């Protein structure tokens, strides 16, 4: 949280005297002792506090109500500190606490002050320090991993419910995301009952239909016939990647190929198959230790749906057809029937009133509600589309019902930013402090990995992003985080790593990576995916990325899987990563600590149950000599001495410390 004009809480009757944000006693020293001497003294007066290090704060990360937290701040003795106060506030100012920190000890040139406190209830809190000295007082704020006087950020501290748990099977899992129409087709493609018009491609390897209609509409109504049986047929292939969670994009009956325009929540799209086919797929997955997670699209429906029925393709009386429709209250009409609230102004996606009692009954609470229906058929959880648009009250009702039906079901939300402090539509969300979501899509990790791999960051930004998420999220959420590099909403990762082209759809359809670009992209993807699979959380592989698929954003990131045309070396690389992670509990569950994050080199440890792994990535142009250990996986790695290894440029490895 950025500080702009945050009021200070100070001791005594008089506020600190400041000039342009600096305490006057420092400015007086500038005058009395000279500018150079002032700068020297300021450099020597660096105050030490980093909430991510145990010497300054324990426990690490989030708290539960009533749990004791200990803070230690190191202040140079030359500051002549007389009192240190840590000031906590919740966001709306309804709760505040001032913790006076006691002098603990002197360590070298530093005085160490310590304070202990607890927080009474779940919520999001922020804090800073006020330091009294013999010459005056000043506030201390956060600046990256460092501190800064009178300007900067507040430290964040989340308090989560003590009974907030997440599914054990989802912790450290490996996820495989499938866009159902484009993965694999088996048997006859059923078109009976399919919403019209549609196009069925004659060849699996044809280009996706990217051209708009004569009226300028993009219909997304071209299909290749991927289905449940096709996924079942390829379940051994999916398992060979070390996958433990299969996440499917929407499967309900819909007009489009992406199926985010739901037509009938409780009916599978005819082209995908029947409910029996779906259950068979789930059983095949479960037999291989793979759970099935579905896409829950509860922010909007399709205009061509059982509920809205603008196109009159359903026998029901939809909200568009009559104000007496049982679904009329689901929607907001400004001028019925043609003017209504729609998702991002797409008139084919009318937005629903999430807290409408009839909608809640249909989706959540009825005996055969939508969430109950698919769980009974074999699903193990839901990824919630545009979670930011689902009210916290809706999410709590949904969680209660899902956990009642299947206590270890997974609820994963689509959130693009730091979900611990996310503000959406003017409201701070309570995904974790309210115990609503088990996990979220970890787009911040994706950004951090891409910036490091593309040499836009030397390593420090990567470390700051990773540790910020790990600190801000409860550990049970961190372990379930969906760590992705590519999805149906991003360019293919191979393309994203080397080509930021942003031309027209026609240009993108014709544009492909050159041989040189592809070589660089594959090299970068190998290291990016290595980081993805060695960080805390659950790596997620978008179908076909392991095969070398390329393409820009929708629809070019949704081409068909290239069966028989895969990149064999890349496929082997991802299988190795899958085996590494599946066979190593330290990577699935371990804590993380960085020991290197600059000069285009990243190094961190993963520790669990007394075992430590060391992870190295070298993006620099020079070799990196590292301590020897048991090599679990390595690339461009050489032994130079019994106790030392050399990691060449563009090399990466993970080693287990010798006992």
Q: How would you name each of these model-derived features?
A:
Residues 181, 425-426, 432, 438-439, ...:
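Aromatic/acidic polysaccharide-binding cleft in carbohydrate-active enzymes
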Residues 40-174, 179, 185, 191-194, ...:
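Carbohydrate-interacting/catalytic domains
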Residues 179-245, 251-376, 398-405:
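Substrate-binding/active-site clefts of carbohydrate-active enzymes
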Residues 18-19:
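Cationic, low-complexity basic patches in intrinsically disordered or flexible, solvent-exposed regions
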Residues 9-12, 28-41:
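Short, positively charged and aromatic/hydrophobic N-terminal segments
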Residues 73, 178, 238, 248, ...:
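Conserved, mostly hydrophobic/aromatic
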Residues 282-291, 299-300, 305-316, 380, ...:
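Active-site-proximal helices and loops of the catalytic beta/alpha 8
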């Amino acid at each position: 949280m950025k500080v702009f004009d945050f009021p200070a809480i100070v001791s005594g009757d008089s506020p600190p005297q400041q000039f342009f944000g600096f305490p006057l006693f420092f400015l007086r020293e500038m005058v009395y002792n000279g500018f150079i001497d002032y700068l020297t003294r300021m450099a020597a007066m660096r105050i030490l506090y980093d909430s991510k290090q145990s010497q300054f704060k324990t426990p690490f990360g989030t708290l539960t109500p009533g749990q004791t937290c200990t803070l230690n701040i190191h202040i140079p003795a030359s500051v002549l500190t007389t009192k240190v106060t840590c000031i906590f506030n919740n966001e709306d100012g309804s709760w505040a606490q001032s913790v006076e920190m006691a002098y603990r000890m002197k360590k070298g040139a530093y005085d160490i002050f310590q304070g202990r406190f607890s927080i009474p209830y779940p919520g999001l809190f922020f804090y800073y320090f006020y330091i009294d000295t013999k010459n005056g007082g000043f506030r201390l704020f956060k600046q990256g991993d460092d501190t800064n006087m009178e300007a900067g950020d507040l430290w964040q501290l989340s308090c989560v419910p003590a009974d907030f748990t997440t599914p054990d099977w989802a912790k450290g899992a490996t996820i495989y995301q499938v866009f159902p129409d484009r993965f694999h087709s088996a048997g006859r493609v059923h078109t009976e009952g399919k919403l019209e018009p549609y196009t069925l491609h004659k060849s699996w390897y044809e280009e996706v239909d990217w051209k708009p209609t004569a009226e300028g509409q993009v219909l997304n109504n071209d299909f290749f016939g991927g289905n449940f049986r096709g996924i079942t047929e390829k379940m051994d292939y999916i398992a060979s990647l070390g996958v433990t969670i299969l996440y499917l994009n929407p499967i309900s009956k819909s007009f489009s190929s992406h199926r985010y325009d739901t037509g009938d929540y409780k009916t599978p799209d005819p082209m995908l198959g029947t409910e029996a086919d779906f259950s068979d797929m789930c059983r095949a997955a479960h037999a291989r230790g793979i759970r099935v997670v579905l896409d829950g699209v509860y922010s909007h429906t399709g205009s061509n749906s059982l509920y809205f029925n603008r196109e009159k393709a359903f026998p029901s009386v939809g909200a568009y057809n009559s104000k007496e429709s049982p679904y009329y209250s689901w929607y907001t009409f400004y001028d019925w029937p043609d003017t209504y609230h729609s998702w991002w102004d797409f008139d084919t996606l009318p937005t629903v009133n999430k807290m409408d009692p009839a909608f809640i009954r249909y989706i959540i609470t009825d005996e055969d509600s939508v969430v109950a229906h698919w769980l009974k058929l074999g699903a193990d959880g839901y990824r919630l589309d545009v979670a930011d648009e689902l009210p916290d009250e809706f999410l709590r009702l949904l969680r209660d019902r899902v956990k009642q039906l299947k206590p270890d079901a997974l609820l994963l939300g689509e959130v693009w930013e730091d979900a611990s402090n996310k503000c959406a539509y003017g409201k701070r969300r309570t995904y974790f402090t309210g115990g609503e979501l088990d996990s979220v899509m970890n787009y911040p990790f994706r950004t951090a990995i891409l910036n490091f791999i593309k040499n836009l960051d030397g390593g420090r930004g990567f470390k700051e992003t990773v540790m910020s998420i790990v600190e801000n999220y409860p550990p049970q959420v961190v372990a379930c985080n969906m760590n992705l590099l590519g999805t149906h909403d991003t360019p293919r990762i191979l393309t994203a790593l080397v080509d930021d082209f942003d031309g027209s759809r026609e240009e993108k359809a014709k544009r492909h990576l050159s041989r040189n670009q592809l070589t660089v992209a594959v090299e970068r993807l190998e290291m990016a995916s290595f980081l993805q699979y060695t960080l805390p959380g659950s790596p997620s592989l978008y179908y076909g990325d392991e095969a070398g698929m390329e393409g820009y954003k929708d629809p070019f990131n949704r081409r068909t899987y290239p069966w028989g045309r895969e990149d064999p070396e890349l496929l082997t690389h991802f299988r190795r990563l899958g085996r590494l992670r599946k066979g190593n509990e330290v990577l699935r569950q371990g804590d993380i600590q960085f020991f290197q994050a600059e000069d285009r080199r990243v190094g961190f440890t993963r520790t669990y149950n007394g075992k430590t792994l060391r992870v190295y990535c070298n993006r620099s142009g020079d070799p990196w000599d590292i301590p020897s250990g048991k090599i679990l996986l390595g690339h461009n790695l050489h032994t130079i001495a019994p106790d030392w290894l050399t990691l060449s440029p563009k090399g990466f490895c993970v080693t287990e410390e010798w006992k």
